[in-house]
Swiss-Prot record:
This is Voltage-dependent L-type calcium channel subunit alpha-1S. Disulfide bonds join 226-254, 245-261, 957-968, 1338-1352. Residues 747-760 are annotated as: Interaction with STAC, STAC2 and STAC3 (via SH3 domains). It is a multi-pass membrane protein. Residues 1522-1542 are annotated as: Interaction with calmodulin. It comes from Homo sapiens. It comes from the Eukaryota. Residues 280-301, 602-623, 1001-1021, 1312-1330 dip into the membrane without crossing it.
Length: 1873
């Protein structure tokens, strides 16, 4: 191929067009002196932008990290030669980095211009590190010089350098700037910082509140413990940590002989954990929120003050702090990821569009190039073939000559046979039989590996060895057959085959190495376990599973960048930890701290441990003790651990989950069409039983992969490819496809009520309809019409009966909980037994009744055909049997008694909401099946590897110096706490670890506890110390074993468990949506509509009394708010300043301050009560809260005063006497402790002030509302498990130092629930499990037989605790998360989309216009109201008036007769418009659909409200839309008139042509615009708007005038023409009214009005001034705009009958050429509707009379007696004038119909108003117009006239948006905003 081919040339030409990577634009000068031409700068630029330079720097950074890691920190700042060498190497790194920074600064400039060096965040980081490094070196030199002069100071100076040296650890962060995908992850996290900051505030706030409560309640309580009398030795039993005690009350007593309870103990954890002052209190609370070690704190507090109520404090803390607030972090992160991904997507789309054209060009070049290449390739190929063949023929002739024909034939035959064999082989390999055969071998392989265990017999070992070889040969055969059959290229195309090949080769290698003795059998046998991955071969025909596996593999790849970030993070903190704590975890006692920072691998493990959150607190305590204990420098250490924990555990680990949830959710949004397609394909495949993926499917998959968005961001990396994953997981949902595919039901059975397809909640709210009696007879004797059966049916379906049964279920459950588990024959149990009989009989009767009604089980619809009924039957049967079997076979009875616990489950069938949640759970479980399977397989694989590595190695002798069981005999000495004086003699025992890897089951159990993060460090260190089978441990023997655990934790615990959790969450969210699947509203729309329907206006109370008004003014001012805010903050500070052992003076001051604050807050309450009166005050929940707090505080003050007064006799506690032995410190005002809480509660008031936090709270409460059934389910779960626990484990003795002790046991129901709650938070649950397993000591009071005291507990504990933990951790807690994520999506959502949290603003602003909360305001105020509310809800203040009005017409609320609009209708219209709910298509139909939807979802909506927000069809009402339509037509007429004037230069003659032109204006301009507005198509509308404004500028139509809305386009142009000269004159008749002034609702009431007038018909003073000047009260403008007021300039102006008469719209003739009748338009629109016929229409407001500018004769010619006419005569005259224009009406109807406004054409009032406007525009009298219209009509054929008049009635459908019924146009389509 020639290089200079034309294609090549073309390609080269096109090449430059490719987008070049952007180079930083270089500033012309750097450092003020170096220009771009400067050689130094040129050199620097070329070096810095040279690609290898970056690589060199990255390598240097990497080398620096290695150097930092190799450094060995030593105690007491010792050093060795390695460390000294590394110190010297440090200088080299520093020089390299300094040079790099200097060159970059020279190249790019330092700071002052864009793109300078320091303008990039990463460079700032680099620069800081380099600068600190240089600074450290300088300081060190100074130190050296100083140490020569003054040796004493060296020690002190050296410390500063050490602190600065710690900054070196940030250098690895520079790797981030080199790896783009890392920056993406970080960017996503940074983006989430703002909402995370809100959450951090909320957490901080909670911590502060709880810390202060803790301080008030528990300070000084932790300092007493049990000492041996007369010594300072703490008295504890074996294995027990010292804990607080109490001399009185119900705290812990000292039971050990010779011990007493006394003070002087520093407290638990060396005095770090306590509530003595605010700082320690906060630390303790924070530790509890992290759910690590919180039970210890609870138990210590229980020991100190009794266990009656401290649990309330801790449980609420965990629920609010851990489950709720910390899960918000997850909500925020996943929201951010979704947003980032969407951004990347849209960015990608945009770029695609931009590059498309260019790509096309490039493509043409490339394509021609490639095709050319291919052609040449093929030609080459052919030539090669030919030459071969030719060669062949040559040789052939030679051979022929030699007579060697036979060989040739043999070769040919061989090729032929080879081909046949290959085909055969190919068919075999692809056949199903072969596949199942391979699966069988894999199963055998799995079996042989899984059968390995510790101490296995020799024959088994041999068998396994043989099996291993045989199976290996089989696998090799399979591999070779595949290679032969498929050909190498095709074979290696499949990833699975490559993997297979690797496994087989490693197996062969292993056998060779072991045989040759080059390697111990152990090390490589791990490879054998990798063979287990072959299990995944099963997935070949299980498509859903194989896709899940494929997507998981892909997602691992995409999470790689996150793992890299995690690794960097761990490295940095490990290095920092080494700098801070290296060599310091070296304490007086003999115990070795395993989690330390003494070398790099160990530091990595320690940081990783903190990251998983396991036992991080003990590491923090050690760190604090290393720096001198709980005092000044030591406490700073906790900052390191807290930052590490927060960033690592909350943020980075939640990012895992966020990515998982985000991708799952993203995949959920695959269109239902796609899902249906997949489902259909799957069904076809299943029916045909096709084995493999079709080619088409493969190609679609490949395409899908290519289509991944190319934007930046985790969004793409983390795309997890869960698209396929999800769609296929959806395919798995076989058991209940109906629950996942919209409109897809099971194949075999139609909808059955038992399928866990949740019933829509809407149906659940109302009572279900009774199930009819089935046709068949019941018990073969009762026919369907039998009276007894009918009666039973009536009873069973009665509400009272259901409630009665529910009550009995509750009572029987309570009875179960009340049983005494220890003393079986106690009095309590006897009484309960009788009750039990009663309950059982009631339930039996219920079941008999139901069976009589529905039949037993033979026919459809019978009792036993429903799962829930079967459950009922089981429970009742169990109760009956256990009552029968009183004494016999004890164990059977025991099990049956346990089964009674299922009773509460019967409530599920009765409470519909609960049933829905339960069904939801079933669906979730069925959906998760695949993930469980994959996780289990992985778990199994790791378990097998664990067995290979650790079987039989977890034994040890209690005396660590002995290594084997033989040596481990006899006794040995122990020095207690390293004290040579305390010597103990102990017996040597050979013990086995509780969790071990001796066989696969134990290994899986051990790994399961690791995956829950509980107790894994202990297991890890046992594994690291493990030596050989049956030999004791050696310290840090194989540190590399940590890799096994860390990989397991990352893969299973971080990744699989999070995918699992994500799945549960997504499933629950989906299930929540299925309820509303067919209601066509999405979640946000539902919430907004619900808000609009349920909201009520706020009462804005403004007192009338002047003094009260003054108070009200003060109380509602912002200064008052700030003052209270400051006072609450002060109060908080005062509360936080208290501490243990504070001086008397301090006590006195704090008491005085407390009284002072109480008085201030009481004053605030009194002032507010005065201002708002009781009704207004208690209307606000915050005020109620304030009130309670004030009352509580007052009681608190009174109590503490009494207490102080009685202090001499021992306080309140001792009023009844008998307090001689009370410790005054302990009586610490327990009675008033409760009321002291009120002091702290004031803090919560702060929440009502901060906006962001308030929104958080709002949602918080929302999510609580969403939780009731979920909470009920959790309560049920806890109840059932607690009762089972009491029955099973209640008899275990309480032994201090074990897990079942005085604080943690199953002996009473509350204790059992608390213990389960502890397990749910994961606090050492595996140790409780072990403490409950078989062989534990029995409680002395229980009824065990002699010699059986060690028979309590049962191995059922394993199933019990694991099932409970899984249910809790994966389902229940995730329900919390799901609910939270559902409710908190607003935190990260797009704020431009209207959401329910925006709607509060509407209520607040509405209240200003409607302070009495009547729910109505004048429709004129709506425009101002909506312009005050910012988008997305309102229009915002910059919305042009014309657009605002168009939007109003789109919203089109119904008007009441008094001209007001209602609150709910306006809000509903706003929501509907903003969210485009049913705004397209035929409008009446849309309205009806929306009404139906609302009735379906919100069944309890009153019809009155529904008619208010969506008026039913045929409702003849005036709407805002009418006004606008008329207004628009007038405006077009005005423009038309203006055009004519400008065209002719004078007023044209009155003729037919003009009227025709006017009608054309309706058809061609006005009608389409109204259509558009009405159909909500404002996108085109706003374009048009701009065009019109431009045209108007040219025409000079729109003049600016200061109206109500500030600068507004003046549409209200004069309608009568003036001589051209006067066209631009503007008499200065009215003042401008600014927007701000007008905003006050009071302002609108400032204008005097005629008391008789209707507010709606206000004077339309909004005419052009010239009209007023010429005495022309023109009312032809739309009433919507008639609210523009002008201030009167003429104080002498008075109202005369004449002006009023003129305003009434009578045809008052005025002399003069331009005169015209002032028929008021609003009459046509409103009066007829608003008033019953025959009543007088109300008079509109008067027009201000203008004196001076009107000629006398005109004035006098106005008949003065008009106003004396009777109402009747007025209305009749008006009616006659209205009905006198049939011809005009017909013409206008035609025009409207042609314009597509058939519905308006049917509205007589509208036609009349338009006729009037037409007359005005043409400047004719109506009579003149009528004459010309008649002529026009005559000119047309009659049939056409008929047709068009019919058309106006029939063509209503041509405009679906307007109402067909006459005049009802209230339901215009809201425009799109």
């Amino acid at each position: 191929m020639e290089p200079s081919s034309p294609q090549d040339e073309g390609l080269r030409k096109k090449q430059p067009k490719k987008p070049v990577p952007e180079i930083l634009p270089r500033p012309p000068r750097a450092l003020f002196c170096l220009t771009l031409e400067n050689p130094l700068r040129k050199a620097c630029i070329s070096i810095v932008e040279w690609k290898p330079f970056e690589t060199i720097i990255l390598l240097t950074i990497f080398a620096n990290c290695v150097a930092l890691a190799v450094y060995l920190p030593m105690p007491e700042d010792d050093n060795n030669s390695l460390n000294l060498g590394l110190e010297k190497l440090e200088y080299f790194f520093l020089i390299v980095f300094s040079i790099e920074a200097a060159m970059k600064i020279i190249a790019y400039g330092f700071l002052f211009h864009q793109d300078a060096y320091l303008r990039s965040g990463w460079n700032v980081l680099d620069f800081t590190i380099v600068f600190l490094g240089v600074f450290t070196v300088i300081l060190e030199q100074v130190n050296v010089i100083q140490s020569h002069t003054a040796p004493m100071s060296s020690k002190g100076a050296g410390l500063d350098v050490k602190a600065l040296r710690a900054f070196r650890v940030l250098r690895p962060l520079r790797l981030v700037s080199g790896v783009p995908s890392l920056q993406v992850v970080l960017n996503s996290i940074f983006k989430a910082m703002l909402p995370l900051f809100h959450i951090a505030l909320l957490v901080l706030f909670m911590v502060i509140i709880y810390a202060i409560i803790g301080l008030e309640l528990f300070k000084g309580k932790m300092h007493k413990t049990c000492y041996f009398i007369g010594t300072d030795i703490v008295a504890t039993v074996e294995n027990e940590e010292p804990s607080p005690c109490a001399r009185t009350g119900s705290g812990r007593r000292c039971t050990i002989n010779g011990s007493e309870c006394r003070g002087g103990w520093p407290g638990p954890n060396h005095g770090i954990t306590h509530f003595d002052n605010f700082g320690f209190s906060m630390l303790t609370v924070y530790q509890c929120i992290t759910m690590e070690g919180w039970t210890d704190v609870l138990y210590w507090v229980n020991d100190a003050i009794g266990n009656e109520w401290p649990w309330i404090y801790f449980v609420t803390l965990i629920l609010l702090g851990s489950f709720f607030i910390l899960n918000l972090v997850l909500g925020v992160l996943s929201g951010e990821f979704t947003k980032e991904r969407e951004k990347a997507k849209s960015r990608g789309t945009f770029q695609k569009l931009r590059e498309k054209q260019q790509l096309d060009e490039d493509l043409r070049g490339y394509m021609s190039w490639i095709t050319q290449g291919e052609v040449m390739d093929v030609e080459d190929f052919r030539e090669g073939k030919l030459s071969l063949d030719e060669g062949g023929s040559d040789t052939e002739s030679l051979y022929e000559i030699a007579g060697l024909n036979k060989i040739i034939q043999f070769i040919r035959h061989w090729r032929q046979w080879n081909r046949i064999f290959r085909w055969k082989c190919h068919d075999i390999v692809k056949s199903k039989v072969f596949y199942w055969l391979v699966i069988l071998i894999v199963a055998l392989n799995t079996l042989s590996i899984a059968s390995e265990h510790h101490n296995q017999p020799l024959w088994l070992t041999r068998l396994q060895d043989i099996a291993n070889r045989v199976l290996l040969s089989l696998f090799t055969t399979e591999m070779l057959m595949k290679m032969y059959g498929l050909g190498l290229r095709q074979y290696f195309m499949s990833i699975f085959n490559r993997f297979d090949c690797f496994v087989v080769c490693s197996g062969i290698l292993e056998i060779l190495l072991v045989e040759s003795g080059a390697m111990t059998p152990l090390g490589i046998s791990v490879l054998r376990c990798i063979r287990l991955l072959r299990i995944f071969k099963i997935t070949k025909y299980w498509t859903s599973l194989s896709n899940l596996v494929a997507s998981l593999l892909n997602s691992i790849r995409s999470i790689a960048s996150l793992l890299l970030l995690l690794f960097l993070f761990i490295v940095i903190f490990a290095l920092l930890g080494m700098q801070l704590f290296g060599g310091r975890y070296d304490f007086e006692d003999t115990e070795v701290r395993r989690s330390n920072f003494d070398n790099f691998p160990q530091a990595l493990i320690s940081v990783f441990q903190v990251l998983t959150g396991e036992d991080w607190t003990s590491m923090m305590y050690n760190g604090i003790m290393a720096y001198g204990g709980p005092s000044y420098p030591g406490m700073l250490v906790c900052i390191y651990f807290i930052i590490l924990f927060v960033c690592g555990n909350y943020i980075l680990l939640n990012v895992f989950l966020a990515i998982a949830v985000d991708n799952l959710a993203e995949a959920e949004s695959l269109t239902s069409a796609q899902k249906a397609k997949a489902e259909e394909k799957k069904r076809r495949k299943m029916s045909k039983g096709l084995p493999d993926k079709s080619e088409e499917e493969k190609s679609t998959m490949a395409k899908k992969l290519e289509q991944k968005p190319k934007g930046e961001g985790i969004p793409t990396t983390a795309k997890l490819k869960i698209d396929e994953f999800e769609s296929n997981v959806n395919e798995v949902k076989d058991p209940y496809p109906s629950a996942d595919f919209p409109g897809d039901d099971e194949e075999d059975e139609p909808e059955i009520p038992l399928s866990p397809r949740p019933r829509p909640l809407a149906e659940l709210q109302l009572k279900e309809k009774a199930v009819p009696i089935p046709e068949a007879s019941s018990f073969f004797i009762f026919s369907p019409t039998n009276k007894i059966r009918v009666l039973c049916h009536r009873i069973v379906n009665a509400t009272w009966f259901t409630n009665f049964i529910l009550l009995f279920i509750l009572l029987s459950s309570a009875a179960l909980a009340a049983e005494d588990p220890i003393r079986a024959d106690s009095m309590r149990n006897q009484i309960l037994k009788h009750f039990d009989i009663g309950f059982t009989s009631v339930f039996t009767v219920e079941i008999v009744l139901k069976m009589t009604t529905y039949g037993a089980f033979l026919h459809k619809g019978s009792f036993c055909r429903n799962y829930f009924n079967m459950l009922d039957l089981l429970v009742v049967a169990v109760s009956l049997i256990s009552m029968g079997l009183e004494s016999s076979a004890i164990s059977v009875v025991k099990i049956l008694r346990v089964l009674r616990v299922l009773r509460p489950l019967r409530a599920i069938n009765r409470a519909k909401g609960l049933k829905h949640v339960v069904q939801c759970m079933f669906v979730a479980i069925s959906t998760i099946g695949n993930i469980v399977l994959v996780t289990t397989l992985l778990q199994f694989m790791f378990a097998c590897i664990g067995v290979q590595l650790f079987k039989g190695k977890f034994f040890r002798c209690t005396d660590l110096s002995k290594m084997t069981e033989e040596e481990c005999r006899g006794y040995y000495y122990v020095y207690k706490d390293g004290d040579p004086m305390q010597i103990e003699l102990r017996h040597r025992e050979w013990v086995h670890s509780d969790f071990h890897f001796d066989n696969v089951l134990s290994a899986m159990m051990s790994l399961f506890t690791v995956s829950t993060f509980e107790g894994w460090p202990q297991l890890l260190y046992k594994a690291i110390d493990s030596n050989a089978e049956d030999v004791g441990p050696i310290y840090n023997n194989r540190v590399e074993m940590a890799i096994f655990f860390i990989i397991y934790i990352i893969l299973i615990a971080f990744f699989m468990m999070n995918i699992f959790v994500g799945f549960v969450i997504v499933t629950f969210q989906e299930q929540g949506e299925t309820e509303y699947k067919n209601c066509e509203l999405d979640k946000n729309q539902r919430q907004c509509v619900q808000y609009a329907l349920k909201a009520r206006p706020l009462r804005c109370y403004i007192p009338k009394n002047p003094y009260q008004y003054q108070v009200w003014y003060i109380v509602t001012s912002s200064y008052f708010e700030y003052l209270m805010f400051a006072l609450i903050m002060l109060n908080t500070i005062c509360l936080g300043m208290q501490h243990y052992n504070q001086s008397e003076q301090m006590n006195h001051i704090s008491d005085i301050l407390n009284v002072a604050f109480t008085i201030i807050f009481t004053l605030e309450m009194i002032l507010k009560l005065m201002a708002f009166k009781a009704r207004g005050y208690f209307g606000d929940p915050w005020n109620v809260f304030d009130f309670l707090i004030v009352i509580g505080s007052i009681i608190d003050v009174i109590l503490s005063e009494i207490d102080t007064f009685l202090a001499s006799s021992g306080g309140l506690y001792c009023l009844g006497g008998g307090c001689g032995n009370v410790d005054p410190d302990e009586s610490a005002r327990i009675s008033s402790a409760f009321f002291r809480l009120f002091r702290v509660m004031r803090l919560i008031k702060l929440l009502s002030r901060a906006e962001g936090v308030r929104t958080l709270l709002w949602t918080f409460i929302k999510s609580f509302q969403a939780l009731p059934y979920v909470a009920l389910l959790i309560v049920m779960l806890f109840f059932i498990y607690a009762v089972i626990g009491m029955q099973m484990f209640g008899k275990i003795a309480l032994v201090d130092g074990t897990q079942i002790n005085r604080n943690n046991n199953f002996q009473t129901f509350p204790q059992a629930v608390l213990l389960l709650f502890r397990c749910a938070t994961g606090e050492a649950w595996q140790e409780i499990l072990l403490a409950c397993s078989y062989g534990k000591l029995c409680d002395p009071e229980s009824d065990y037989a002699p010699g059986e005291e060690y028979t309590c507990g049962t191995n059922f504990a394993y199933y019990y605790f694991i099932s409970f933990y899984m249910l809790c951790a994966f389902l229940v807690i995730n329900l919390f998360v799901a609910v939270i994520m559902d409710n908190f999506d607003y935190l990260t959502r797009d704020w431009s989309i209207l959401g329910p949290h925006h709607l509060d603003e509407f209520k607040a602003i509405w209240a200003e216009y409607d302070p009495e909360a009547k729910g109505r305001i004048k429709h004129l105020d709506v425009v101002t109201l909506l312009r005050r509310i910012q988008p997305p809800l309102g229009f915002g203040k910059f919305c042009p008036h014309r657009v605002a009005c168009k939007r109003l017409v789109g919203m089109n609320m119904p008007l009441n007769s008094d001209g007001t609009v209602t609150f709910n209708a306006t809000l509903f219209a706003l929501v509907r418009t903003a969210l485009k709910i049913k705004t397209e298509g035929n409008f009446e139909q849309a309205n009806e659909e929306l009404r139906a939807i609302i009735k379906k979802i919100w069944k309890r909506t009153s019809m009155k409200l529904l008619d208010q927000v969506i008026p039913p069809i045929g409702d003849d009402e005036v709407t805002v839309g009418k006004f606008y339509a008329t207004f628009l037509i007038q405006e077009h007429f005005r423009k038309f008139m203006k055009r004519q004037e400008e065209y002719y230069g004078y007023r044209p003659k009155k003729d037919i042509v003009q009227i025709q032109a006017g009608l054309r204006t309706i058809e061609e301009e006005a009608a389409p615009e109204i259509c558009r507005t009405v159909s909500g198509d404002l996108a085109a509308e706003e374009e048009l708007e701009r065009a019109m404004v431009e045209a108007a500028m040219e025409e000079g139509i729109f003049r600016r005038t200061g109206g109500l809305f500030g600068q507004v386009d003046n549409f209200l142009e004069r309608t009568n023409s003036l001589p051209p000269v006067m066209a631009n004159q503007r008499p200065l008749q009215f003042a401008e009214i600014e927007m701000e002034e007008m905003e006050s609702p009071v302002f609108l009431e400032d204008f005097p009005q005629d008391p008789r007038t209707n507010p709606l018909a206000r004077a339309n003073t909004n005419n052009a001034n010239a009209n007023v000047a010429y005495g022309n009260s023109n009312h032809s403008n739309s009433h919507v705009f008639s609210s523009v007021h002008y201030e009167r300039e003429f104080p002498e102006e008075t109202e005369t009958p004449a002006t009023r008469g003129r305003a009434l719209g009578q045809p008052c003739r005025v002399l003069g050429p331009h005169s015209k009748p002032c028929v008021e338009m609003l009459k046509g629109l409103l009066t007829q509707r608003a008033m019953p016929r025959g009543q007088a229409p109300p008079a509109p407001c008067q027009c201000p009379r203008v004196e001076s500018s009107m000629p006398e004769d005109r004035k006098s010619s106005t008949p003065g007696s008009l106003h004396e006419e009777t109402p009747h005569s007025r209305s009749t005259r008006e009616n006659t004038s209205r009905c006198s224009a049939p011809a005009t009406a017909l013409l206008i109807q035609k025009a409207l119909v042609r314009g597509g406004l058939g519905t308006l054409a049917a509205d007589a009032n509208f036609i009349m108003a338009t006729g009037q406007a037409l007359a005005d525009a043409c400047q004719m009298e109506p009579e003149e117009v009528e004459i010309m219209a008649t002529e026009l009509l005559k000119g047309r054929e009659a049939p056409e006239g008929m047709a068009s008049s019919l058309g106006c009635l029939n063509l209503g459908s041509s405009l679906g948006s307007l109402d067909q019924h006459q005049g009802s146009q209230e339901t215009l389509i809201p425009p799109r905003l």
